[in-house]
């Protein structure tokens, strides 16, 4: 990936257990820690302003693209407010009232059942990739597409470029959050090959975004994870004569791996930045080479000249 490396980030929340995706998305999207299962909200019920809210207030276009459903924890953390990440009706209503211009996720029965409500909220709605281009003239678009899994009919890289083309029509700029949500899902199930293929898909998406950027100097790309899952360790060991090799993407090589956990861990994750070299001098957010996950929000505020 053609990106510059920056400090590792810390995945935190208010309790002592490892963060869930709702709390970590809230931290990155709002700059505040909360408890697990809460989305865009403090433990006392206070609703938090997200980076999408800030961008909307500046007249910028906003968008979310995910291989998960739009009611998943990460997209919800950037666009909704509720005490429970599983409160689907509340999540959907909050998300549709968020003002986010583009909502794109994998097909979901709850979203499909609310197609009329989605359209009543002013969204151009489509369930076929062939119909995506037809929504470009609308101020708001809702794309429900087959994006899930390693054999997805629609590729995350392709739809991410469509999202960039849609949002970049706004001359005031845009903020777009893209999620490859299946690395986490496969690691939860200790499905190593699925996790590798999902990371490869993320890499292809990053490359597509970089190619789209070309020589542009007005767009910054941040790449990170909300947490690690499974305690995965991988090593390259000597080969033994009776080992069965697995060929992945035309490459046959022996790798040894182990999952040390069945859930999220507190392992620090990487942050990669293209377009700027940030000045990490705020000791409240950055200390000894580690940036708090809440610092992602404040970094984005700085990029929007809002801090």
What does each model-found stretch correspond to?
Residues 55, 173-181, 206, 220-226, ...:
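Beta-strand elements within well-structured catalytic alpha/beta cores of enzymes
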Residues 73-79, 147-149, 160-164, 169-173, ...:
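Active-site His/acidic residue clusters
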């Amino acid at each position: 990936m053609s990106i510059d490396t920056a400090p590792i980030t810390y995945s935190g929340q208010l309790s002592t257990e490892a963060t869930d995706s709702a709390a970590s998305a809230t931290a990155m999207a709002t700059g505040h820690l909360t408890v697990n299962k809460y989305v865009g909200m403090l433990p006392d019920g206070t609703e938090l302003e997200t980076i999408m809210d800030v961008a909307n207030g500046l007249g910028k276009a906003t968008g979310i693209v995910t291989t998960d459903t739009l009611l998943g924890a990460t997209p919800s953390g950037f666009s909704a407010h509720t005490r429970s990440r599983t409160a689907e009706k509340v999540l959907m209503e909050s998300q549709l009232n968020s003002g986010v211009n583009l909502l794109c996720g994998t097909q979901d029965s709850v979203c499909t059942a609310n197609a009329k409500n989605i359209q009543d909220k002013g969204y151009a709605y489509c369930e076929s990739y062939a119909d995506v281009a037809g929504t470009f003239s609308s101020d708001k678009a809702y794309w429900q597409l087959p994006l899930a899994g390693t054999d997805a009919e629609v590729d995350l890289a392709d739809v991410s470029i469509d999202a960039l083309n849609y949002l970049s029509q706004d001359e005031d700029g845009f903020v777009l959050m893209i999620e490859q949500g299946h690395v986490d899902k496969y690691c939860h199930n200790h499905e190593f090959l699925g996790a590798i293929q999902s990371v490869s898909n993320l890499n292809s998406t990053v490359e597509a975004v970089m190619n789209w950027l070309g020589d542009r100097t007005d767009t910054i790309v941040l790449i990170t994870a909300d947490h690690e899952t499974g305690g995965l360790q991988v090593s390259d060991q000597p080969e033994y004569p009776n080992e069965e090799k697995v060929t992945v993407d035309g490459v046959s090589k022996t790798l040894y791996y182990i999952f040390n956990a069945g859930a999220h861990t507190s392992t620090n994750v990487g942050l990669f930045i293209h377009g700027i070299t940030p000045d990490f001098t705020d000791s409240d957010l950055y200390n000894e080479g580690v940036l708090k996950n809440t610092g992602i929000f404040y970094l984005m505020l700085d990029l929007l000249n809002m801090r």
